[in-house]
């Protein structure tokens, strides 16, 4: 069975990717990060999520991106923006963008893949996020893959899989539902309460709620 490293945050996108990788028959080696993020609820959710899958290993990597901040997710002095309607959502890079986060995460995944002999890495980026998050662009993924194949000692090519890349958020949710993803064990909120209730009006919550609405399905998680 082929091995794959799956980046799993605890959000809806990475949960869908996890289900896709399982459907493709990979031996799953999951990797999550505690990077000092405001939303530690992600890590609690991901531990529940992976119980539903035949995960060979689950690594939680501890790094502290609060060391340089620059994002509302890693600097408590920067407020998470809240909105009233999806039409108010920003079209440029928001303060919730974490500088170089996907580069850091993919670099760790690459190192892990090299150690276990995996030639496939999965990440849940998609182009509907690319206007807000520059490290979700297809050209970024292509460039990272090229770098990875210059930088490692595996021998055969590393492939960075982005199965959601051309999907809108509602398509991602639809795909996950078809694959049996239990979205109850996910959280997308940038600013959850201490008891893991989603705020319902940050950028991530608004996009998520809109996606479930377009699928005529109620989001199974709890909101404030």
Swiss-Prot record:
The enzyme's E.C. designation: 6.3.4.20
Needed co-factor(s): Zn(2+)
Keyword entries, A-Z: ATP-binding, Ligase, Metal-binding, Nucleotide-binding, Queuosine biosynthesis, Zinc
Keyword GTP-binding: no
Cofactor comment: Binds 1 zinc ion per subunit.
NCBIfam families: 7-cyano-7-deazaguanine synthase QueC (TIGR00364)
Free-text function comment from the UniProt entry: Catalyzes the ATP-dependent conversion of 7-carboxy-7-deazaguanine (CDG) to 7-cyano-7-deazaguanine (preQ(0)).
GO-annotated molecular function: ATP binding; ligase activity, forming carbon-nitrogen bonds; zinc ion binding
One of the Pfam families matching this protein, by short name: QueC
Protein name: 7-cyano-7-deazaguanine synthase
Gene field: queC
Matches recorded under PANTHER family: 7-CYANO-7-DEAZAGUANINE SYNTHASE
Family, per entry: Belongs to the QueC family.
Pathway: Purine metabolism; 7-cyano-7-deazaguanine biosynthesis
InterPro entries per UniProt: QueC, Rossmann-like_a/b/a_fold
Reactions listed under catalytic activity: 7-carboxy-7-deazaguanine + NH4(+) + ATP = 7-cyano-7-deazaguanine + ADP + phosphate + H2O + H(+)
């Amino acid at each position: 069975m082929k091995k794959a490293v799956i980046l799993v945050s605890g959000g809806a996108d990475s949960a869908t990717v996890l289900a896709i990788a399982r459907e493709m028959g990979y031996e799953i080696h999951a990797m999550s990060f505690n990077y000092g993020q405001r939303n530690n609820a992600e890590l609690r959710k991901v531990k529940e999520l992976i119980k539903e899958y035949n995960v060979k290993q689950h690594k939680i990597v501890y790094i502290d991106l609060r060391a340089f901040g620059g994002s509302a997710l890693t600097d408590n002095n920067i407020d998470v923006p809240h909105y009233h309607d999806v039409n108010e959502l920003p079209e440029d890079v928001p303060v919730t963008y974490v500088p170089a986060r996907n580069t850091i995460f993919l670099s760790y995944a690459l190192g892990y893949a090299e150690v276990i002999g995996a030639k496939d890495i999965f990440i849940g980026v998609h182009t509907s996020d690319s206007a807000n998050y520059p490290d979700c662009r297809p050209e970024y993924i292509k460039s990272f893959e090229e770098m990875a194949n210059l930088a490692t000692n595996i021998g055969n090519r590393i492939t960075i899989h982005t199965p959601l890349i051309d999907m809108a958020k509602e398509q991602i949710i639809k795909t996950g539902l078809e694959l049996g993803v239990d979205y109850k064990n996910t959280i997308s909120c940038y600013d959850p309460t201490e008891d893991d209730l989603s705020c319902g009006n940050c950028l991530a919550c608004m996009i998520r709620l809109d996606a479930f609405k377009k699928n005529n399905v109620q989001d199974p998680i709890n909101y404030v």
